[in-house]
C-alpha cells in the first residue's frame, strides 16, 4: 500500500534534505574503504561501495548517516576533483587505451583517448599528460580522460626527469636564441677594468658563471670590494621575445644531474658567462667593508668591462686556505686576492654573528648521474670556507643593492621575511617559556628582537627547540617595496647577483641601470612577485620529486636488507615518522605499525613533534635514530623504514 505513495516519497525527500552534510577530502586506503577528512582531527568512514564514485584527494560534500552504530558518509556532490591535468602511464587492453594516474592511492585504470589536437600514437608503457573530462560523482557513468601529450616511452632512462617536469608543467628544453639575441644592445660607456685581477670561485663543472670579485686592502684596515655581475640585460631588451620567455620561466631549473636554463645556453654559459680570460660586460658595485665589518654608506654602481683572470673551484680554494692538499693559486696576485677575500669573509661573519643572523652549516647531497641517466652515487657536500667567502661577498652586494634602490627610487624586487605573525609569536613565546627561555611577543616581532632570539637559539644549539620555533615562523616572500628580512637579520635585502638564472635579478639589473643612466624607472607590477613565488614553489617540488624517484632507484639496486642507517627525524605525521638518512639524504617513512604493534597505545603528536607509547615519549623531531629499510616502492617513490630497537614490553 505504500508503493508509489507521493506522501511517503515527499517524506523521504524531506528527511534526505534535512540529513546532515559534511565537506572534506577523500582519503583512500589499499583495502577498498576510505575516509572523508573534514579537518586534521576529524574523519568519517567511507564504505567500499561508496568509494566507487570518488577518487583519493577529491573534495566533496557527503551525506552523514549511521550504519550499525557507526557514522558513515555517502558522497553526494563533487566540489573539486583531485585529478584535473595529470600525468600517468598508458595501458593497452584489447586495443583500448587506459591511463593509470601516477599518484599514490590512485591505481584504477581510467578510460582515455587522445584529444583532437594530440598527434601522438600511444603504446603500452608510454607516459602521457591527460585531462580528466568525466567524473562519476558528476553523474557520468565512468571516469574518462583525454590524452593531450606524450611525455616519453617506457624504455627512456630519463623518465624520472621528463615525467616530473610534465607533472609540474615545467619546460624541459632550453629556450632557443635567435641571431639578434647574441648581439650587445647597449652602447653605454663602460669602465675598463680588464687589467684588474678579478677571479671567480664556483663548482668545477659550473658553466653559467654570474659573479667575479676583486678586492684590495686599504692602509687603515678597510677592504675595498668590487662585485662584477654578468650583464644579460645588455643583450636582452625589455619586452623582447627572449625577455618574455625568461619572464615565464623565472628561474633556471636545477634538477639532480642537469639543469634547464632560463636563458639560451649560448648566452648563459658562453656570451654572458664570466669565463676566464674573456672580455665581458658587467654591472658592478664598489663597496667598502670597514675593519669592524660594517658596510660603508658610500656605494657605487656602474657599468664596466672585466676579464676574469682565473676560474677557481670551491674545493681547491678551501684546501689552500686550510693548508691541505697540493693545489696552489696560479699566481701570487690571485693568492693575494684569496687571502684578502678570506679576511673579508671572517670580518663579515663576526659582524653578522653579533648584529644579524648566521646560518647553521648544513649538509647537502648531490646525485652523481651519467649522461644516460644512470645514478652512479650520492655525494655529500659540506659548505666549506670558499663557499662562505662567496656567500658573504654576495650578501654584502645584495644589502648594498637594496639600500641603493630604496634610496634612489624606493622600489625593486626585495626578498622579505616577516618573522612571526601575531598568533605564532604568542605560540612561540609560550613554547620558549616551557624551556625557561623568556621572551615577549613584542620583542620577537621586532627585527632586533628576532635576531636576538636566533642568536640565543644558536648558542643553546638544541635542534628540537630550533625546529619547533622554525615551525612558527612565516615563509619568505617577495615584495616590490622595501621590507625587512627577519631570517637574515637585515632591514632590507634585494638580490641582483644571479641575472643569468633568476628573472627577479634581471628586473633589479634594469632598475639599477636606470638609476646609473638617470632614466625613468618603472616599478614592477604586483603580479610579478606572485609569479616568482609560484615558480619557485613548482621548481622546488620538481627537484624533490626527481630526488625521491632517484633515491628509490638508487637504494633498490643496493643490498639494503639488514643494513643499519643513521637517520634524523624530520617530521611527525598522523600515522608515522618521517626521517632523512644521514649517509645519502634519502627521505624515509616509518609507519606506526613498525614502531609499536598496538595502535591504541601510540600517539603521534604533530603539535609537539613527538611520539608517545603508553604516554611515554620515545621519539621527537631532530632525534638521531638507527633504522633498517623494510621496503622500497618504486611505483610510489617511497622508502619504508623501521627503527632499530628492543621490543617494547
UniProtKB/Swiss-Prot annotation:
Q: Which keywords belong to this entry? A: Cytoplasm, Exonuclease, Hydrolase, Nuclease, RNA-binding
Quick check: keyword Ubl conjugation in the entry? no
Report the locations given in the UniProt record. Answer: Cytoplasm
Q: Which PANTHER family match?
A: EXORIBONUCLEASE 2, RIBONUCLEASE
Q: What is the originating organism of this protein?
A: Buchnera aphidicola subsp. Acyrthosiphon pisum (strain Tuc7)
Pfam families annotated for this entry? OB_RNB, RNB
Under SMART domains, the record lists: CSP (SM00357), RNB (SM00955)
Q: What HAMAP family is this protein classified in?
A: RNase_II
Q: Which gene encodes it?
A: rnb
Q: Which reaction does it catalyse?
A: Exonucleolytic cleavage in the 3'- to 5'-direction to yield nucleoside 5'-phosphates
Q: What is this protein called?
A: Exoribonuclease 2
Q: Tell me the domain of life.
A: Bacteria
An annotated GO cellular component of this protein is: cytosol
Known EC number(s)? 3.1.13.1
